[in-house]
Swiss-Prot record:
One of its GO terms (biological process) is L-aspartate transmembrane transport. It comes from the Bacteria. The chain crosses the membrane at residues 21-38, 53-75, 88-110, 153-175, 196-218, 231-253, 301-323, 363-385. This is C4-dicarboxylate transport protein. Residues 438-460 are annotated as: Disordered. One of its GO terms (cellular component) is plasma membrane. InterPro entries: C4_dicarb_transport (IPR023954), Na-dicarboxylate_symporter (IPR001991), Na-dicarboxylate_symporter_CS (IPR018107), Na:dicarbo_symporter_sf (IPR036458). It is a multi-pass membrane protein. Responsible for the transport of dicarboxylates such as succinate, fumarate, and malate from the periplasm across the membrane. The keyword Ubl conjugation does not apply. One of its GO terms (molecular function) is succinate transmembrane transporter activity. Keywords: Cell inner membrane, Cell membrane, Membrane, Symport, Transmembrane, Transmembrane helix, Transport. Belongs to the dicarboxylate/amino acid:cation symporter (DAACS) (TC 2.A.23) family.
Amino acid sequence: MPTTPLRKTAMTTRQPIYKSLYFQVIVAIVIGILIGHFYPETGKALKPLGDGFIKLIKMVIAPIIFCTVVSGIAGMQNMKSVGKTGGYALLYFEIVSTIALLIGLIVVNVVQPGAGMNIDVSTLDASKIAAYVTAGKDQSIVGFILNVIPNTIVGAFANGDILQVLMFSVIFGFALHRLGSYGKPVLDFIDRFAHVMFNIINMIMKLAPIGAFGAMAFTIGAYGVSSLVQLGQLMICFYITCVLFVVLVLGSICRAHGFSIFKLVRYIREELLIVLGTSSSESALPRMLIKMERLGAQKSVVGLVIPTGYSFNLDGTSIYLTMAAVFIAQATNTHMDITHQITLLLVLLLSSKGAAGVTGSGFIVLAATLSAVGHLPVAGLALILGIDRFMSEARALTNLVGNAVATVVVAKWVGELDTDKLQSELASGGSAILETRPEDDLGVAEGPTPANAVNTTKTV
């Protein structure tokens, strides 16, 4: 009987709009806003729904990163390409995140959203930010580097530290590659284990609307729409800056490399809506690994760039850090000359690299930065504590788009991008992840095993 590749079947399947994930998440967010506004106590009580969904996602992030990176590296013929990919990725991250920091600094100086507030620092309640300041003091260059090395292998996975898991995965992948055919059974096991993990993600993502509903209901219920008005100028300024950064800066990078930022945003629309609902770019990480490989980037590039980008390429967080720091100075009438601002920029070039893609990490890094600079009042963090949750959504969305662009660009730089596949996927707008395709199992390094090969076709 004739067979039809599963890829073709998945790509041509169309579903009613009410069954699509992005439609369900949009409806859930709207309902969450209404519940939080009209029934704030009920909204606050729904917080566990959002927290539970994020915990479910974080539960599988470490094993997925491990499988993706190990199989990608172990299956490569030339180990030099791994170092080349990592080097180009870090170069891209440093250049683009520096541009993001500079744009935030320029915009906040031009617009001056904090001017005229005349806040007396002594009147601010610093008790609410004590935990953030304490966490921020632990942020240092040496501490950050040492923290990348896990105390134990189990500890890295148990704590869910992305960089620790990534480091161990890279070492494990190199070691497995050196074993050659002797290590093939281990690689085959990782292949199959990865397939199981991605199927777990598919099941978890069915709960995305519930998670987005709970998180949004809590945010509006706890802080209220009225809390947006007082510091609305900073929020509007920040949101507009993020949009301009994506359209102009990332858009220019995309255009220079032969694809459209608007088509890319459309392609990852479901992931963006999940991030919008949860305020955490980490919630979309597993799906981004699938989407970026479908887009034509080799799995070895995807496995290195995406996880690393969650600490080194947070463009939205970079914009937020410079804008928030200078806003606090403006609101408290703290003088900042060009020397102070250059010092702030240099400190942020280092401290911003320690921000993971989870909710609230940007605020901790901001506390660390203010403590390190010394010139700015740390108590001023209390000014933006109430609206940080609302700004975290723009941060997370910008971070996600930035890492998607980085993956495609780095893949093209190292010659690991299928440009025909890229253009066809972007032109089609991408297919919904209805089921995990065999080729989405990023563990397949050399090609399907005989057992896998049977499942790559579907009888019609």
